[in-house]
Swiss-Prot record:
Function of the molecule: Catalyzes the attachment of proline to tRNA(Pro) in a two-step reaction: proline is first activated by ATP to form Pro-AMP and then transferred to the acceptor end of tRNA(Pro). As ProRS can inadvertently accommodate and process non-cognate amino acids such as alanine and cysteine, to avoid such errors it has two additional distinct editing activities against alanine. One activity is designated as 'pretransfer' editing and involves the tRNA(Pro)-independent hydrolysis of activated Ala-AMP.
Enzyme class: ligase
Annotated protein name in UniProt: Proline--tRNA ligase
Lineage: Bacteria, Pseudomonadati, Nitrospirota, Thermodesulfovibrionia, Thermodesulfovibrionales
Organism of this sequence: Thermodesulfovibrio yellowstonii (strain ATCC 51303 / DSM 11347 / YP87)
Family of the protein in this entry: Belongs to the class-II aminoacyl-tRNA synthetase family. ProS type 1 subfamily.
Broad class of the protein's primary localization: cytoplasm
GO BP, sorted A to Z: prolyl-tRNA aminoacylation
Record note on domains: Consists of three domains: the N-terminal catalytic domain, the editing domain and the C-terminal anticodon-binding domain.
Annotated Gene Ontology cellular component terms: cytosol
Catalytic activity: tRNA(Pro) + L-proline + ATP = L-prolyl-tRNA(Pro) + AMP + diphosphate
Subunit structure, interactors included: Homodimer.
GO MF entries: aminoacyl-tRNA deacylase activity; ATP binding; proline-tRNA ligase activity
């Protein structure tokens, strides 16, 4: 491909308010342009990268026996109504009516539609197992699209779905996908972790996410370097050291205008660990709920929501109305509303908390004696907490979710009547799994993990081109002749390892060398071949590796072999 014929609108100045490195570099290097909030146009270079990623996806899906199909983006509402998600998914779903007034939606995922076709066509155990997949557009009305292509309103997704006769079959399909995902992300050049995750709207069974660590990530993952424990912070667990008891006398203590745990602990000269933090929330399902954690711990809202459903924190007015107590002095003793206490509160230890009386706290509170509660893990794991598996220190990293796998069981097959007859002629629901990868997120994560001050450094497997030839003097006949000769020869070389020809970009623009060098580093092709009059005086061309910036001069007659060798040596 000739640079002069390719549309690569590089930018020098980036609009303000853009922070993610991948967003900045995709704009600067001419890979994407933004149409509106959360809507992006993939330009030729960007589309080539997505196609490279999609090729890897297809190769690995076919390797596990998955069959490619294509589902509509426009869905009739009644299918979503049968599973209940029409009602539980709120503003994120694009909804519309057709000209007859029929309710429709734009697909944000395809569990319902895939299950619908399975319900119509799969009738016998002889037709199972099945794995179907597609690489197709999804739409989600994100409240705050951000991070460039990391969180958008329209995106491409590889989504696959497994259908099995039993739970053992689902385990096999789930593991096949996990193994395929490891191969996919390794081939794409990503550093990643497979972590335990919250299934969210997908169900309530086992699920994992594949996370690419980067400071630009909007997720946080908890990791143990000692044993390999890994989990999204939304579900992560940790152990806390046993707290020695101070055996407080059970009595009220005067704490004038001291409302927060820190204020009271400083006032009394005691560690926050000896306090019970008492929160009041309003649950859509349960109404008012008292939530208790050890004073030095923070609430994990996702964990609590899995227990009580969606909730909001009570205002001062609501607290007074419900409990007759001002916020800051609420405690767990004496209230008859639902209570949930975190495991960080030890049952045999005496604590201090609000006395349910303005300007007073109560000390000597012993859980199980002075109050009862539902006990649960509702706290947020912190850096340096102890690993729940091996007891060593945990660390927390930011990461980008690039893929996920879910065990769905019969969550969709039962309401949509996707049943089959087993060997004994008994009707049973199909057991289902769902698996997704976002190609644009993979591309963005690759940039976040592979860049420098000059631009992108593509892993060679997903680079838009393999090699860039850079003739420096387009008015010099010999320079142009050698560049064209190398362009033809390298393009024709059959790459037996990748089962394809080398894809070569030649920068045939009549531009200054500095401009060509700057653009080459910006767009990030792995190997650069520099051809100039100075080198040709010695009958040599220069090979530069974009990642290491290592250069070497090779003779023109050996250049083709050296170029190919350099390509295979690079990452």
């Amino acid at each position: 491909m000739r640079y002069s014929k390719l549309f690569i609108p590089t930018m020098r100045e980036i609009p303000s308010g853009i922070n993610a490195i991948s967003h900045i570099l995709m704009l600067k290097a001419g890979y994407v342009r933004q149409l509106a909030a959360g809507l992006f146009i993939f330009l030729p270079l960007g589309w080539r990268v997505l196609n490279k990623i999609n090729m890897i996806l297809k190769e690995e899906m076919e390797r596990i026996g998955a069959q490619e199909i294509s589902m509509p983006i426009l869905h009739p509402a009644e299918i979503w109504q049968e599973t209940g998600r029409w009602y539980t998914i709120k503003e994120e779903m694009f909804r519309l009516k057709d000209r007859t007034g029929r309710d429709m939606c734009l697909g944000m995922t395809h569990e319902e539609i895939m299950t619908w076709i399975a319900s119509k066509e799969i009738k016998s155990y002889r037709q199972l197992p099945q794995i179907w997949y597609q690489i197709q557009t999804k739409l989600r009305d994100e409240a705050r699209p951000r991070g460039g292509v990391l969180r958008t309103r329209e995106f491409i997704m590889k989504d696959s779905y497994s259908f099995d006769i039993d739970w053992e079959g689902l385990d096999k399909s789930y593991n096949l996908h996990a193994e395929a995902y490891h191969r996919i992300f390794t081939k794409c050049g990503l550093k990643y972790y497979q972590v335990e995750s919250d299934p969210g709207i997908m169900g309530d069974m086992e699920s994992h996410e594949f996370m690419a660590p980067t400071p630009a990530g909007e997720d946080e993952i908890v990791l143990c370097d000692s044993c390999g424990y890994s989990a999204n912070i939304e579900v992560a667990k940790s152990e806390l050291p046993t707290l020695p008891s101070l055996n407080f006398e059970y009595k009220e203590i005067y704490t004038p205008e001291k409302k927060s745990v820190k204020e009271v602990s400083d006032f009394l000269g005691l560690s926050e660990k000896y306090f019970i933090k008492t929160l009041i929330v309003i649950s859509e399902k349960n109404g008012p709920v008292l939530v208790m954690l050890r004073g030095d711990q923070e609430l994990n809202e996702k964990k609590l929501a899995r227990i009580i459903g969606e909730f909001s924190f009570a205002t001062s007015e609501q607290a007074l109305e419900i409990l007759g107590v001002e916020l800051g002095f609420v405690g767990p003793v004496g209230h008859k509303i639902k209570k949930i206490a975190d495991f960080s509160i030890q049952k045999e230890i005496s604590y201090i908390s609000g006395a349910n009386k303005k300007n007073y706290h109560l000390q000597g509170i012993i859980p199980g004696i002075h109050f009862d509660a539902q006990w649960a893990d509702i706290r947020r794991v912190k850096e340096e907490d102890r690993c729940p598996k091996c007891g060593n220190s945990l660390k927390i990293e930011k990461a980008i979710e690039v893929g996920n796998i879910f065990k769905l069981g019969t969550k969709y097959t039962e309401p949509l009547h996707a049943y089959f007859l087993d060997k004994d002629g008994k009707e049973k629901p199909i057991i289902m799994g769902s698996y997704g990868i976002g190609p644009a997120r993979v591309a963005a994560a690759a940039i976040e993990q592979n860049h420098d001050s000059d631009g992108i450094i593509w892993p060679k497997s997903i680079s838009p081109f393999d090699i860039e030839i850079i003739p420096l003097n387009m008015d010099d006949e010999k320079t142009v002749s050698i560049a064209e000769e190398l362009y033809e020869k390298v393009t024709e070389i059959y790459n037996s390892f990748a089962d394809r020809h080398m894809e070569v970009l030649i920068d045939d623009r009549d531009e200054r060398p500095g401009v060509k060098f700057k653009d080459a580093d910006l767009i990030g092709i792995p190997i650069q071949i520099v051809i100039g009059k100075k080198g040709l005086k010695e009958n040599k061309v220069e090979i530069k590796k974009r990642r290491t910036k290592e250069t070497k001069k090779v003779s023109v007659n050996k250049a083709v072999v050296e170029i190919v060798n350099s390509y295979y040596e690079t990452y």
